């Protein structure tokens, strides 16, 4: 479950970090939604992108406690994460502005992941085998390769993704589809994705 979580969340995270402006521009860059609105919204999306793996992992890691009928620990961790989020947001809102909200959300969630990881290792609830660590490295490597392809794709279609282009969403969809295909092929070649594991009986 950890591998599957990272398999989906790591490329999604890098994709949002790299192409946040193009995504917001393609989806909402029309009419009264100005370039300034696109810039501000994409900045927030970028910071949320940093937290995507944590958002995914924290749900997976909490299940190790739920499976043992331990609901108290996840509750207190969630309470701490929310409290930390609020404290960071209120402490820096005047200096940083609205952008502190996605920043604090990502930071606090990653702290929650670290707490879960520490406790799971302490109680020996989670033992990462070498094969899992190896696959995690492969996932990250595949996602990094995907990021390079995405960067070159955005650069190549820069004019087509311009704010004033009415068909920018189509070009972005093409880029995303191509990049996702490259990522899946890379994962398959590295042995992360195995078709036999996804056959429907």
Name every feature range the model reports, one short phrase each:
Residues 1-201:
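Membrane-embedded alpha-helical bundles of multi-pass transporters/translocases
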């Amino acid at each position: 479950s950890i591998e599957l979580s990272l398999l989906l969340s790591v490329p999604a995270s890098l994709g949002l970090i790299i192409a946040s402006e193009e995504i917001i521009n393609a989806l909402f860059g029309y009419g009264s939604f100005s370039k300034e609105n696109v810039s501000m919204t994409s900045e927030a999306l970028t910071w949320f992108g940093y937290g995507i793996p944590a958002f995914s992992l924290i749900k997976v890691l909490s299940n190790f406690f739920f499976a043992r009928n331990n609901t108290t620990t996840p509750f207190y961790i969630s309470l701490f994460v929310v409290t930390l989020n609020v404290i960071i947001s209120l402490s820096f809102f005047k200096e940083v502005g609205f952008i502190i909200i996605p920043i604090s959300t990502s930071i606090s969630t990653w702290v929650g992941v670290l707490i879960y990881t520490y406790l799971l290792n302490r109680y020996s609830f989670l033992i990462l085998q070498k094969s899992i660590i190896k696959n995690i490295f492969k996932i990250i490597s595949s996602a990094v390769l995907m990021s390079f392809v995405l960067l070159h794709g955005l650069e190549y279609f820069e004019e087509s993704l311009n704010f004033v282009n009415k068909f920018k969403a189509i070009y972005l969809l093409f880029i995303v589809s191509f990049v996702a295909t490259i990522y899946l092929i890379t994962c398959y070649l590295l042995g992360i994705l195995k078709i036999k594991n996804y056959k429907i009986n």
